[in-house]
């Protein structure tokens, strides 16, 4: 590649000059190439340690002038071919021009200008739009690709110098972190270490420090432990590795590949060694942290942040912290965690202005909102730029009229009375009146969609005034007054100052009249509801009358959702719950519906309208409890792992006992999935939900630890899991809320488990207080760190479970051992994942649907199958292997979706590796019949397909069933049963004789098993093979034998067999001609070709004049092997051949004995045909090479090359089998056992090294 000219002071220290002229020098790196010796080792080590560019470009061209001592590098190359091309260009285009100059400075200036011009032209043509990676980074990426054989699609994120500990010896080298792989390379004094690990294989990633490994990063996979140390910035490296491993886990979980963010703004001053991908990942990490901290929608992007102070009017202080600006929000977080947090939606902002600076308030900024609140920020470093950014975002904010109608009233502090609060559904369409047909079934009209406009609790408790509740009512009034005072001091709505006082009020309990509003604010659901007016109503309308698996599951669980609560004992609450769950299933089909969602949603509906409950559910499922509610409840399993880890840390004695009893995994899943709603009385659990919406998952973990802590002694005395579950169940049943104004609702679990001596009641507020006192040291970032660690374990455990499930689903008669099947699965999965990494447009294979059964989740397409087939098949056919692989793929692809799953893949492999000679030959035979054979491979294959599909429909089912390469066994048996049933008219009578009751499923299973066995045993149902298909089979056999040690013996044997089969086909043609003369109403022959033959003209005579013989193609004859011709000719002349099944039916036709004279007469053309088939090289057997039998000059078929092919000629599988059995060398070849384990190991090595084709020369210093 051309380089911008740079000075080189020492031109010959580590370089050898190979070519020179008066103006340029071509040099090679010392030690590169052959015979580097000690110098090569030293230079190679130096290049690796110093990360020299000479490692990837060992050739260079320098510009020099005669009197100057300064050299200028103008080009470098990774191979001699590349550098020679540049050298020749310089000689041809510059040498004559440079000789004209008199001044050497002018020469150098001209050369530099010319080179800069070439580089600019190349960049204009070749550089992709938006490529902003620095030159040094591109060089590192080139080294990585060359060293590890990575394709262009693999992007380098960053690279670091570090040590890799191999045993007790550290190897200094370079760690390359790509989107999909971790790579390491070291070369020290001839010792080379090259390592590639896929991120999806990582099972553990942690940063630790021990005496042996000071500040190291540990990377575990299923079969190795790797340690890296001596990083310049270990924190940054580990954070990036975490992020990349997380992306890989996400890919395994829901098949979301990494997509570069094209909208990421370019930096004003590009960093020297930071790639665009690294900036992208850094921005993602910041965005995720920003959204999680302030509970913002998933599409919110952080624009920037700056240090500042915020004036807080409630305590008259300037609180230091950080201001965060994004496209829709201005947020503030104090340095002290609980001091203050603020969220200002730009839709609420009315005025942003610079205030007058003073010594007390330097660079202040005032922001006013529609709710008459003013926020004063100060100590802003770049106030003018900040104001401009906010102004830009305000211009893009939706119209102010929409904003005021949505959020203006709720953010007001002028009327703190809760009764006058407008409900959030004012943001969308007017709510339906209570008299709307809510109690009717879901078959209502789409013009008037009924939705509940208020919480169900208000509907069912509106007749019980608070004054009648005595002390509880007074307590509730006090709570409401406390919150109203808080709203007056700290603001109300989204712009409220959130402080330690807010948390204190939440822990004391949210009054029921404010619960729905505060849940919406604290969870961030209010923001999404306001910005998507009418979205829920639209979803409800779209989902009306639509049925799916999710809607069926929802209907099944509707009546199990809080059945003890009066709101869900009638159709009013149930219909509302149905609509919310169905709408969410339509919004997020990847989740659809998951158990426990109904319990949580029913509680949300008690305190808010349907639309509010819907958006709270969105916040819960997609942000606050990520991956909880999917088919594999991964998120809950991850937090369960965190809970176990915390139990080990804070309750070590109990942890051992619980592990021994296996209790934690049983209890904690329901606690986390339902937020204690399913295990605790409703009025108590809802207080935990209050805290959860304010604090997040931290509260659930704290309460769970407090529950265990309160029952330590009793749990330690338990002898089994059931006893421990009873202890915890009775404790939770008696957690009460004495302040609740709701009528007590008996807990269903409590009704079932209450005993004679109920335990002491526990107040929920006492439980919460204890949980905060003992376990409040949990931090959100610590929980996220633990989540990452547990996510690796959980997802890899689920992948192992999937592997075992898939292997168990493979039938026992497939022939492979469990270990072999597991190895094959890993190879198959790796090939699928490779398509996700670099698959381009293979969209069908790339996107995996995790909701499918395990067997269907990983699938590969034809090109991927071709690669696996080439490396795993025992039938290596050289250049013909891809053709055979394509046929095998078409044979296995039953549903014609151009993808095959693991079961189909293993079935194909089994056909080649296991079974006797007959089974293997059957597999090979089918590869040369439709649908495996396609017209592009053989001209007459299309005719053959019509021949077998139209004229012999009765043969279709045996073709698709034998060898179990086609339909699943149940479908085969059902199809066979239907066919037999249609032919047996007396079946109903027979059933009536047996009895009037229909047979049970076991009867059909027995029938299917019998039919399957029968089909496996028969070989007579296979369709016949015509002449051109037979020629293709001979080609395949020839190529298959070309790499065998017994090559010549196999050639001779297959030539003999082919000549025999050609004569059998000719004799069969004579019998076919005789059958055509029979009357049409004669007995029906079992020959599938009879219908065709009756309609065709009489077949020409077998014996033809020698002058009418077709001439062989000259090209093929010139390249035929002479030795093969001699063997074949002798074999044809000396053989007495017994032919069975002359009619081609395999039905036991009379045997015929052919004399030598008949053989010579009949085989005048066959001898040439067999010689061509048996002795031509693979590359000679093209589609233009015509191989014909004795009657090949029949005018009924014409090949593409102008020769002729006899379509009347055909043979059966039995004839091929019988002929091959006459040659022991062929029998031995097909019965030879091949160990697939060795081929799997080789394939894994290939995938680990990624030895893709590369134009670069191999390194010459790898001694």
From Swiss-Prot:
Compartment list: Membrane
Positions marked as site (Arginine finger): 556
Location of the region described as Disordered in the Swiss-Prot/TrEMBL record: 397-449, 977-1002, 1075-1126, 1139-1159
One Pfam short name: RabGAP-TBC
Modification type Phosphothreonine: residues: 397
Gene Ontology CC terms: membrane
Compositionally biased tracts (Low complexity): 422-447
Record-given protein name: TBC1 domain family member 9B
Source species of the chain: Mus musculus (Mouse)
Species classification: Eukaryota, Metazoa, Chordata, Craniata, Vertebrata
UniProt gene name: Tbc1d9b
């Amino acid at each position: 590649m051309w380089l911008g000219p740079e000075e080189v002071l020492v031109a010959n220290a580590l370089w050898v000059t190979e070519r020179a002229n008066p103006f340029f020098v071509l040099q090679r790196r010392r030690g590169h190439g052959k015979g580097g010796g000690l110098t090569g080792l030293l230079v190679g080590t130096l290049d690796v340690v110093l990360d020299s560019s000479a490692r990837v470009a060992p050739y260079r061209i320098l510009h020099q002038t005669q009197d100057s001592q300064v050299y200028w590098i103008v080009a470098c190359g990774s191979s001699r071919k590349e550098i020679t091309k540049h050298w020749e260009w310089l000689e041809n285009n510059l040498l004559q021009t440079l000789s004209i100059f008199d001044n050497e400075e002018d020469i150098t200036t001209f050369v530099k200008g010319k080179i800069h011009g070439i580089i600019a032209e190349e960049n204009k043509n070749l550089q992709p739009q938006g490529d902003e990676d620095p030159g040094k980074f591109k060089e590192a990426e080139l080294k990585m690709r060359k060293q590890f054989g990575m394709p262009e699609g693999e992007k380098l994120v960053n690279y670091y110098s570090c040590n890799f500990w191999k045993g007790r010896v550290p190897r200094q080298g370079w760690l390359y972190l790509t989107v999909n792989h971790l790579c390491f390379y070291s070369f020290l004094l001839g010792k080379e270490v090259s390592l590639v690990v896929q991120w999806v294989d990582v099972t553990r990633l942690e940063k630790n420090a021990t005496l042996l490994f000071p500040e190291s990063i540990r990377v575990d996979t299923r079969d190795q432990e790797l340690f890296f140390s001596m990083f310049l910035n270990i924190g940054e490296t580990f954070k990036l590795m975490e992020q990349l491993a997380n992306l890989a886990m996400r890919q395994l979980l829901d098949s979301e590949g990494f997509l570069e963010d094209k909208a990421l703004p370019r930096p004003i001053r590009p960093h020297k060694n930071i790639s665009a991908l690294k900036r992208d990942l850094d921005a993602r990490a910041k965005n995720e942290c920003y959204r999680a901290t302030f509970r913002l929608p998933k599409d919110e992007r952080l624009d920037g942040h700056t240090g500042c102070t915020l004036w807080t009017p409630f305590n008259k202080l300037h609180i230091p912290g950080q201001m965060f600006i994004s496209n829709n929000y201005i947020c503030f977080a104090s340095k002290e965690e609980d001091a203050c947090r603020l969220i200002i939606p730009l839709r609420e902002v009315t005025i942003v202005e610079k205030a007058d600076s003073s010594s007390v308030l330097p660079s202040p900024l005032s922001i006013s909102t529609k709710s008459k609140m003013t926020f004063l920020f100060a100590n802003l470093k770049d106030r003018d730029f900040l104001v401009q950014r906010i102004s830009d975002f305000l211009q893009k904010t939706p119209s102010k009229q929409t904003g005021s109608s949505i959020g203006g009233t709720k953010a007001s502090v002028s009327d703190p009375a809760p009764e006058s609060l407008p409900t959030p559904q004012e943001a969308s369409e007017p709510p339906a009146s209570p008299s709307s047909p809510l109690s009717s079934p879901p078959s209502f009209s789409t013009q008037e969609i009924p939705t509940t406009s208020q919480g169900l609790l208000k509907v069912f408790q509106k007749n019980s005034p608070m004054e009648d509740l005595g002390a509880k009512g007074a307590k509730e009034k006090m709570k409401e007054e406390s919150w109203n005072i808080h709203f007056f001091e700290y603001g109300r709505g989204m712009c409220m100052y959130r402080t330690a006082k807010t948390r204190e009020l939440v822990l004391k309990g949210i009054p029921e009249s404010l619960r729905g509003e505060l849940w919406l604010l604290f969870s961030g659901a209010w923001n999404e509801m306001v910005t998507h007016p009418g979205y829920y109503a639209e979803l409800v309308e779209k989902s009306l009358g639509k049925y799916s698996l999710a809607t069926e599951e929802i209907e099944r669980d509707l009546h199990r959702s809080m059945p003890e609560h009066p709101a869900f004992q009638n159709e009013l609450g149930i219909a509302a719950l149905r609509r919310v769950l169905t709408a969410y299933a339509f919004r997020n089909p990847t989740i659809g519906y998951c158990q426990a969602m109904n319990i949580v949603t029913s509680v949300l509906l008690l305190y808010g309208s349907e639309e509010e409950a819907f958006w709270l559910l969105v916040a819960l499922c997609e942000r606050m409890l990520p991956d909880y509610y999917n088919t594999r409840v991964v998120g809950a399993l991850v937090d369960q792992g965190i809970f176990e880890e915390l139990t080990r840390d804070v309750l070590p004695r109990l942890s051992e006992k619980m592990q021994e009893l296996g209790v934690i995994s049983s209890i904690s899943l329901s606690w986390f999935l339902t937020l204690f709603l399913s295990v605790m009385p409703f009025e108590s659990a809802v207080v935990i939900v209050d805290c959860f919406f304010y604090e997040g998952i931290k509260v659930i973990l704290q309460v769970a630890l407090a529950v265990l802590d309160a029952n330590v002694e009793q749990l330690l005395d338990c002898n089994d899991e059931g006893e421990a579950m009873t202890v915890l169940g009775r404790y939770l049943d008696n957690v009460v809320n004495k302040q609740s104004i709701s009528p007590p609702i008996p807990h269903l679990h409590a009704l079932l488990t209450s005993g004679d001596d109920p335990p002491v009641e526990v107040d929920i507020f006492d439980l919460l207080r204890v949980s905060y006192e003992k376990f409040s040291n949990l931090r959100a970032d610590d929980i996220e760190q633990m989540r990452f660690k547990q996510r690796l374990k959980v997802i890899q455990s689920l992948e192992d479970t999937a592997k075992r499930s898939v292997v168990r689903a493979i039938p026992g008669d497939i022939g492979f051992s469990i270990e072999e099947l597991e190895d094959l699965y890993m190879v198959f999965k790796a090939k699928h994942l490779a398509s996700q990494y670099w698959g381009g447009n293979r969209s069908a294979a790339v996107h995996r649907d995790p909701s499918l059964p395990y067997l269907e989740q990983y699938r590969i397409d034809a090109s991927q199958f071709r690669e696996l087939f080439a490396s795993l098949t025992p039938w290596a056919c050289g250049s013909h292997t891809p053709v055979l692989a394509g046929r095998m793929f078409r044979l296995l692809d039953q549903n014609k979706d151009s993808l095959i799953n693991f079961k189909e893949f293993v079935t194909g492999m089994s056909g080649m590796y296991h079974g006797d000679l007959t089974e293997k030959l059957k597999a090979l035979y089918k590869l040369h019949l439709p649908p495996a054979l396609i017209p592009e491979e053989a001209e007459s294959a299309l005719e053959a397909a019509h021949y077998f599909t139209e004229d012999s429909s009765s043969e279709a089912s045996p073709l698709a069933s034998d060898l179990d390469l086609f339909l699943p066994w149940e479908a085969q048996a059902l199809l066979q049963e239907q066919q037999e049933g249609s032919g047996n008219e007396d079946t109903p009578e027979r059933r009536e004789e047996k009895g009037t009751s229909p047979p049970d499923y076991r009867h059909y299973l027995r029938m299917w098993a019998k039919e399957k066995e029968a089909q496996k045993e028969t070989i007579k149902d296979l369709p016949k093979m015509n002449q051109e298909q037979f020629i293709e089979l001979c080609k395949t056999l020839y190529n298959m034998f070309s790499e065998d040690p017994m090559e010549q013996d196999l050639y001779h044997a297959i030539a003999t067999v082919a000549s025999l089969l050609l004569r059998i086909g000719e004799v069969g043609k004579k019998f076919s001609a005789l059958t055509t003369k029979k009357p049409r109403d004669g007995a029906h022959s079992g020959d599938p070709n009879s219908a065709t033959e009756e309609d065709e003209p009489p077949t020409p005579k077998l014996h033809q004049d020698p002058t009418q013989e077709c001439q062989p193609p000259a090209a093929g004859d010139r390249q035929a092997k002479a030795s093969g011709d001699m063997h074949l000719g002798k074999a044809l002349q000396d053989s007495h051949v017994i032919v069975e099944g002359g009619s081609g039916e395999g039905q036991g036709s009379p045997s015929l004995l052919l004399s030598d004279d008949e053989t010579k007469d009949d085989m005048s053309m066959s001898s040439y045909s067999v010689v061509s088939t048996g002795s031509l090289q693979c590359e000679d057997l093209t589609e233009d090479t015509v191989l014909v039998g004795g009657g090949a000059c029949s005018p009924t078929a014409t090949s593409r090359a102008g020769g002729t092919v006899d379509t009347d000629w055909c043979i059966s599988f039995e004839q091929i089998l019988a002929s091959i059995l006459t040659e022991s060398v062929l029998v031995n070849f097909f019965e030879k056992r091949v160990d697939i384990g060795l081929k799997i190991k080789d394939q894994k090595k290939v995938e680990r090294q990624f030895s893709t084709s590369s134009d670069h020369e191999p390194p010459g210093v790898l001694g």
